[in-house]
Swiss-Prot record:
Residues 395-416 are annotated as: Disordered. This is Large neutral amino acids transporter small subunit 4. Affinity and transport activity are regulated by a phosphorylation switch state at Ser-274 and Ser-297; increasing of affinity and amino acid transport activity via dephosphorylation at Ser-274 and phosphorylation at Ser-297. Glycosylated. One of its GO terms (molecular function) is L-phenylalanine transmembrane transporter activity. It comes from the Eukaryota. It is found in: Cell membrane; Basolateral cell membrane. Pfam families: MFS_1 (PF07690).
Amino acid sequence: MAPTLATAHRRRWWMACTAVLENLLFSAVLLGWGSLLIMLKSEGFYSYLCTEPENVTNGTVGSTAEPGHGEASWMNGWLSCQAQDEMLNLAFTVGSFLLSAITLPLGIVMDKYGPRKLRLLGSACFAVSCLLIAYGASKPNALSVLIFIALALNGFGGMCMTFTSLTLPNMFGDLRSTFIALMIGSYASSAVTFPGIKLIYDAGVSFIIILVVWAGCSGLVFLNCFFNWPLEPFPGPEDMDYSVKVKFSWLGFDHKITGKQFYKQVTTVGRRLSVGSSMRSAKEQVVLQEGHKLCLSTVDLEVKCQPDAAAAPSFMHSVFSPILLLSLITMCVTQLRLIFYMGAMNNILKFLVSGDQKTVGLYTSIFGVLQLLCLLTAPVIDYIMDWRLKECEDASEEPEEKDANQGEKKKKKRDRQIQKITNAMRAFAFTNLLLVGFGVTCLIPNLPLQILSFILHTIVRGFIHSAVGGLYAAVYPSTQFGSLTGLQSLISALFALLQQPLFLAMMGPLQGDPLWVNVGLLLLSLLGFCLPLYLICYRRQLERQLQQRQEDDKLFLKINGSSNQEAFV
């Protein structure tokens, strides 16, 4: 039996803490591909594609044999070669594609069925993916193809876990942004999971046993969701407070009414009650004569609070707006850069150390540990996006007792939307600067310097999604936020599929040398500066519009003697 929203609210701290842990262990774990790749090769996945070399002796994972490019080597008693790398990288491409592309349909499904069912499905898919990998590892020569299905389910299940956890912060009021940062940070830090599992694997624990236990832990996630997550979605901060336990059926309200609708309806009632005492005044009599009923029936509440749809741009208008198109370019380039590096990192390191598998394994573990930096970087970008917003004036807020304070000179506040655009511009400029720095360090064939590349890669990955989300929230209507974010994820995931041909080009014609691929991606990443440059122009446009509105308000005040523009209900 699913708990109610009130019960879920009482358990919100338990749900939030477990959600952070579950994100770390079960969400985007596929981003720790470098460590998983070593384990898959050590277990013989697609080893049958390799031809046994004549001059390389049998070794282990830590073998220091240095075969030439394209030659086979031994890992834990299994052959390893370029054909195997290409096939496994293709499986990673499929899984990472689903990790991003599934966002749009997930948003549609969650709007219809709520987060509970989606999270149950995601945890079940993750458990099945672990069992499929374990089953494939039992007979790798015959069942290696299962890795494609397993990684697809892994990506889908992981994104279900991430997507549903982002609804939990709605229950924490003023701490909402902090918990969103924690959820995003734990999602981005989940790349540390496979490096941690690799440490257990290197300690001698069977790969199959590890995966079976992991699947069992995913079953615990299923049970936690089953007993604690409600059927209804968690209302946002602007929605009804959980402490309200009064039933409003006597008012004829639907049980799924949102807090925003409730607020508008109750506000309408309050206005009519305040008007009731002066109903006999001339102005109200005119209103009554024009057919505007001021009664308190439930029928009268139904249509008096309709949103101003005319003020909001259409969805297609938002899709073809310059900000969205430039953000798509930025996200596509960034996603391709990050995904290619994760997929090709082992081969890049192998090229730098001339095939020393022990050193490759060490640096792969370092990369995995550094993913925990995302828990720190996610709040940083959140702070940048919220910079000075508390000092701003919200356009939706109506000034109270403005006439009484006309003689007092007040400190002029910033416009909230302009400040949000300014913050987004700074966030994107800083993030893209880090991305360019990452591209430069990748060009330098120095092994210790790659640790700096790991750090920059982690920071950019933790920054970019929060920056895009903050920009969309500032520019577009809230009703379009989910659809636009899902569309952006889908398009950037499709573009990131280019990492497979880039990997094939690096392993084939370029003979394992990533130099020219990195040069091309570095030049491509310069396109990311187009968005902050446009945001500067857009901010100036908003400032001109704000100045025009202020001049209009002064003119209205001069003509009417008051700046309080009221609308009669």
